[in-house]
Regions:
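Core catalytic region of metal-dependent phosphoesterases/phosphodiesterases
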Residues: 2-95
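Conserved beta-sheet core of the metallophosphoesterase superfamily
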Residues: 84-85, 94-101, 106-134
Length: 134
């Protein structure tokens, strides 16, 4: 199965359209969203083409392919416009001999086992790190 992973869209219809286009180009089967989908947050500037309703509509058009965890800017109000669950702090996804542990990453950490892969958002910096389990 092919996955596309995204986080911290913060209501940017512009970047959400790019995400959907890339998802379709990749012919992925699952879109893993790591939170902060609609609201920009009080400390962040408005993102490019900020439109929570358009962003929600784009994401809802892919709802059957989405697995999502909640971010620190996501709220109960978001659940009223999004047609897929966004309330879990973690998601556990078995992939072959490994387990993907999905979280936004802002305040809660799952217990990882040897070979698990932690996938998180929140920091607005793309990175890949290989570490031991502590």
């Amino acid at each position: 199965m092919k996955y596309v992973i995204a986080s911290d869209i913060h209501g940017s219809a512009y970047y959400c359209r790019l995400l959907k286009k890339r998802y379709e180009e990749e012919k992925a089967q699952k879109l893993l969203l790591l939170g902060d989908l609609l609201y920009h947050g009080a400390r962040n500037a408005l993102p490019k083409e900020y439109s929570t309703l358009e962003t929600a509509a784009i994401l809802n058009s892919m709802k059957s392919d989405i697995l999502c965890v909640r971010g620190n800017c996501d709220s109960d109000v978001d659940t009223m416009v999004l047609e897929f669950p966004i309330v879990a702090a973690f998601a556990i996804l078995p992939v072959g001999a490994h387990t993907l542990v999905l979280t936004h990453g802002h305040n809660e950490y799952a217990v990882l086992k040897e070979g698990d892969v932690l996938v998180n958002g929140h920091f607005h910096v793309p990175a890949f790190e290989r570490r031991g389990v502590y």
